[in-house]
């Protein structure tokens, strides 16, 4: 969680990083490869649970393993949500090793950290978070060529972030439904391991911004937030938005820092190359079952 402190003491974060420039071509290639997915846009419905499973400790999905949850609800026996309190993977439901896949599962409310992919290169397919706690999915570690994928599924009631990306490489989010949330994706803005360059491709999303029960840490929604000074790049395509009365932006850029607990300064909202790559033709506003192209910043 990013607290509200000044970032201007981090002079090193404002300087160009030669390593990031070197890794940029590798990660850009990974981003291009990741863009081949094409999931359908969600219809806004939530799946019915086929049963329940509670774990006493985090369940590890090994490298190369595919865990099919068969649409049951998974949570923890001894963990309850404590809002935006950070705790680590010991309070998650699932921990995925590189190359692991979690699919067809519902993550219940009795947990704190949802799903962890602590070395990147994992696949999350048709996974649903019924009530997000601190984060739904945390992606860490990896290399510049790492690609982690979130295909289908959905999440709701996130006070802040749904997907937190602290590691390296690319994240792909395709065909995802998010409801009542603060941010769908955040490239970590205050990790001690920064500066790290991160890449994002999001497409075929349905985003319902109406406040239902989330206690948002920021009243204004940023669907994705990237760190411009670290060379982050996001590509957005076919984004369907059901707006609420609060302000929102599809993509915000910030000045990232490596000061834990600081709050990065927002630099811009809306399309801006290369950090926020999209046009308003890529955004479809859904009002009373009618769809219109977005024409201006919100």
Predicted regions and their residues:
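LRR N-terminal entry segment and analogous cap-like coil->beta motifs
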Residues: 65-67, 71-72, 77-79, 88-92, ...
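Extracellular beta-rich repeat passengers
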Residues: 41-55, 59, 66, 71-86, ...
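Poly-acidic low-complexity segments
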Residues: 2, 20-22, 113, 134-135, ...
């Amino acid at each position: 969680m990013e607290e509200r402190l000044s970032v201007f003491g981090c002079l090193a974060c404002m300087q160009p990083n030669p390593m990031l420039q070197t890794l940029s071509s590798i990660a850009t290639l990974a981003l291009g490869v990741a863009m081949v997915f094409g999931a359908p846009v969600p219809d806004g419905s939530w799946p019915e649970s086929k049963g329940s499973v509670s774990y006493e400790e985090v369940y590890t999905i090994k490298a190369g393993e595919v865990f099919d949850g068969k649409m049951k609800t998974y949570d923890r026996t001894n963990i309850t949500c404590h809002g935006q309190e950070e705790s680590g993977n010991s309070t998650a439901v699932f921990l995925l090793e590189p190359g692991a896949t979690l699919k067809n599962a519902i993550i219940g409310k009795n947990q704190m950290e949802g799903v962890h992919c602590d070395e990147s290169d994992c696949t999350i397919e048709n996974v649903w978070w019924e009530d997000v706690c601190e984060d739904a999915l945390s992606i860490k570690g990896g290399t510049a060529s790492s690609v982690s994928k979130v295909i289908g599924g959905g999440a709701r009631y996130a006070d802040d972030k749904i997907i937190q990306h602290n590691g390296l490489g690319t994240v792909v989010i395709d065909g995802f439904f998010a409801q009542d949330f603060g941010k769908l994706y955040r490239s970590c803005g205050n990790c001690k391991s920064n500066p790290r360059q991160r890449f994002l491709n999001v497409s075929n999303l349905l985003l319902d911004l109406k406040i239902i029960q989330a206690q948002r840490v920021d009243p204004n929604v940023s669907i994705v937030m990237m760190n411009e000074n670290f060379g982050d790049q996001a590509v957005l395509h076919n984004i369907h938005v059901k707006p609420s009365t609060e302000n929102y932006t599809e993509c915000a850029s910030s000045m990232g820092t490596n000061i834990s607990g600081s709050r990065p300064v927002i630099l811009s909202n809306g399309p801006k190359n290369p950090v926020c790559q999209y046009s308003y033709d890529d955004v479809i506003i859904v009002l009373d079952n009618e769809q219109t192209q977005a024409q201006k910043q919100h």
